Amino acid sequence: MNVLQPHLRTHLVHMPIMAACGNAVHLHSQLDATTRAQGSNPRGPGLSRLIAAGLLFAVSSLAGCDAPTSDTSATGQASLQEQQSATAITQPAGPSPRVAALLEALTLEQKVGQMIQGEIKSVKPEDVRDYGLGSVLNGGGSFPYGKKQATVAEWLAVADAYYAASIDTSAGNAGIPIIWGTDAVHGHNNVIGATLFPHNIGLGAANDPELVGKIAAATAREVKATGIDWIFAPTVAVAQDPRWGRTYESFSSDPERVRQFAAPIVTGMQQSGVVATAKHFIGDGGTFRGIDQGDTRLDLETLLEEHGQGYIEAIAAGTLSVMATFNSWNGDKIHGSRELLTDVLKERMGFEGFVVSDWNGIGQVSGCTNDNCAQAINAGIDMVMVPEDWKAMYLNILAQVRAGEIPMARIDDAVTRILMVKEKIGLLDRRAPSIEAAPLISVIGAPEHRAIAREAVRRSLVLLKNQQGLVPLDPRGTLLVTGPGADDIGQQSGGWTVSWQGTGNTNDDFPGGQSILDGIAAQVSAAGGSVITSVEEGTPDAVIYVFGETPYAEGVGDIETLAWQQRSKQDLANINALLETGKPVVAVFLSGRPMWVNAEINAANAFVAAWLPGSEGAGVADVLLRNANGEVQYPFEGRLAMPWPRFDLNASNPDLPVADVLFPIGYGADAGEDIDVTGLPEGAIGVLETSDEILFEGSVREPWMIYLGDELDPALAAGPSNAKSAAGHLSLSVVDKEVQEDARRLAWGESGQTTTVYFGRGQAWDASGLAGAGGALTFAIRTVEAGSKNLQLSTQCGANCGATVALNQIFETAALGEWVQYALPLSCLETAGLDMTAVTSPFGLASTGALTLELAQVAIVERPGEGVVTLECGAE
């Protein structure tokens, strides 16, 4: 499947830059000979593009070399020239006269303004006018006016306001139209009613670049319809360890399979008038232990060979932007790496567009903060994504240029790149976004887009087990469809779905979408059969049990082991209970990665890896069910794009990905094929070393939920983002502590009424084991404003049962604005009246007066970590 043979591709990507001119000429001759041997166009146009892109690793070393000696063949020299001209991306064309003239006319302030990107929650239209900002973005779960249910008209109204401000020159602004970026990673996933396609891991299993190109174009049209011109996609990460929380954003663990998707996505988006972004440069899928934003430990040649293929192809296709990655490379944050961002990406790979930083990514560079990082600009960041602290960043860049810390030439290069992109997509001459979008208003969730999504769903599912050819099922009988994921469009869509984490949604948030249950029920009804959802409703002919991961995004999804439900095994118990009906059970597993589900595979009669299919549940029904005549409707085309693990951990070294493969890349059974998989090992290698209960770590962890309580509503579910108590006394909002949205800001008003934020769950929890082991409740707090200094920690164990502890002492232990990790021994709560065997809320904060805090990292642990401040039981 390689467009380049492995030995040739290695030469192209990894040719040492210090190679002598003679070695470079030898490479040219070798390329020419190989091309002649394979024919003029052995694998289509992709070959010449890759050759041209790859040559940059060697061609850059030719500058200043003498002309080839006379014994160099004319044929070889001609071949080099042809290969260099095969794609324009290999030779920077430079700015157009228009861009050059525009740059010349800009003041320093206007240039720096073009380099700044703030988040819409922190940027008003007048800010765009006053500072001449070049860009805004909406992060995951960020909406116009803060309205989750914002209409297309409201999206366009905000886009129009930013546009009008950007061309308003009354405050000294240069009048350059702004560009708005968004994370539309599986459809326009922030917009209610948009088509939601399968996440990349499913598209990798479908393995059809042409289909993926159609999805990219459809997504771009829906994005354009809301007045947005820039998509932060495609993700061309090559996920090597499924423990990584962003595995589902990767098409495959195979660099070649990832490579083949890059060009169709870039082309599909940019031909639809929207800027594409290849991300995250580079190595985000190869971090140690799969830790998000962690360290990728590879030499340069291996880094490019394993993680650079998608960028080579995206650049060859003309991607206009590249996003830098959070992760480090051998200990150093890539946001500060000139070697990778400039020497490799821009100079050797020939990237002509602009590089944008990731969300506050510059702040992770050693010696930098979120609002101050000359090193990142000098390394090659052209546009800085600074969601909240953009104004301070703007002022700091100005000061650093004036002080000589950032060369003016670096500013000019960055702004030139940004202006070239704006010119390329016609932004410099655009009309108001609402006018541009008028012909596209009807495309949001359009039937033709949903048809593409449905096709992608049915072609992505992988049949892992199929005893006696059970699947597809006959729809003319009675089917029991059940399980926690059966009727949940949010769960089947995964992270980056309306909210950043994909949590806090109901089926009502997906107008036009269809759950797996609804998709099955519609087809069964049409065939004359019936669907029931519990054994109490009748006796089924077969059972479909849908289960899987709760949605997550980024580091929140990082896991220590691939074991599914290592603690509870509730799904296994449910499958076994359903088998007691005497009817066959088809298990449909919703996940963002291959996982160790040996026990569940052993138990079920058939097992389907459904990945995260998105809004079109009918696509799942298409392959699970036969038609009304008992015939196969569609084949099972999905084949694994990542290996499926035999064990939960690497037995020899848990730091490494699981090496023992149960099902290899390319595996998948056909519809009706008899594939029996039994006797798989069910003993876990990884053993839980602690019984710690995590309530909040980046997000609220299931089964816990966060509630706001006051005199009007004692149990208002807060969801994953901003919320207010019913009477308005307490507001909750998401903020950043260490990574994006990993903390919550709690602001009490001066109401005189006790208002509480607390964690609860549907069933009582037995914490007596942790209490008996000397455990503690731990939490991190930062005091922002302390008007009343009236704060209590509250816990509950049912009606008229609980304990309250005064927390006024925290105002004495930390300075205003300082994060402190606290621990309260569980024995304190037990003494105060908390029944440890029936805890319904182990943590809450209550106040009656004006107080603003930030909260993070809430857990009940056996042993608090180092640096924790232990609170005294009886202290006020």
What are these regions (language model features)?
Residues I685-K737, V869-E876:
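Extracellular carbohydrate-recognition regions
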Residues G752-G833, S847-E866:
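Extracellular ligand-binding interfaces
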